[in-house]
Amino acid sequence: MLAQKAKIEQSLAIRLVIPQSRPRRGSVIYVQSVRDAAQVRLELALAVLHDLGFDATGEVGDSDPFQATMDAIGERKPDEIVISTLPATASGWLRRDLVERVAEASGIAVQHVISDIDEEGPPPSDVSLVVANRTASSAELTEHLIELAHAEGAEEHLFIVVVPALGTDGRAAAAAQEHLADVLARLRERSLVVAGLVGDPDPFTATMNALQFFRVSRVVISTLPETKSGWLRGDLIERVRRYAVCPVEHVVAGAGDTVSAS
């Protein structure tokens, strides 16, 4: 639809608004992680639009999609609004009459686009979800990610790193955020394209929440060897494989270059 409009309106400018989404799983909600997840989704979507030649900018919006839309309308004064949702049977936005409410409140024409991501196949670029904590900076994991990025015929590769927190308090979240920043910096030094967020203390919940937020080509889970890994004792790899609709890879790292716990 946007491609057709761009042919008609050469000066078409797009402002993309991504509302923050509350994860479905877990008893602990990290506000910064929710915003980080929305920011990564925004950057992915803008990259696709830019590759297609669109003049596009964006912002992370309120967790209420109606409020996020109205905030952007008030600031940007658009000529037209496009709202994309899942099919009616799967869309919470449609159950809350989002399209009709925005049209009535704004007085601006609203186009409704239905996107059935289950029918769209793999993501438009190669995206790996990486879940790790103590082994996130290990040589084994880094080399595996480099191999994926440089595989023969591989497209530009994005790695989304999730570092589960080690507890439910603010100090645990802050420590995980600091650890994540260090991991991302190390991977960028190796010329990898990365983004990341802190996850739920339960690694399975952290992984499932990330799969809710992102369409990925594969999941890469890094752990310590079986004799030292609580994640493996909890059967994390097989549990994720039962639910994920993409391949799940397991990287075992040595205990020599580790931080925190996995």
Where does each model-flagged region fall?
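Small/aliphatic-rich secondary-structure junction motif
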Residues: M1-I29, S115, P123-A174, V251-A253
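Glycine-rich, Arg-bearing micro-motifs that act as flexible, cationic patches
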Residues: S84-R101, T223-R239
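Short helix-loop-beta junction
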Residues: L44-F54, D182-L192
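Short, surface-exposed alpha-helical segments at coil->helix boundaries
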Residues: Q32-E43, R96-V99, A173-A181, G234-I237
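Structural beta-alpha unit
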Residues: L52-E80, S191-R218, T258, S262
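Short, flexible loop segments at boundaries between secondary-structure elements
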Residues: G107-G121, V245-S262
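A short acidic, amphipathic alpha-helical/loop segment
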Residues: M1-Q4, D71-A72, L98, E143-H144, ...
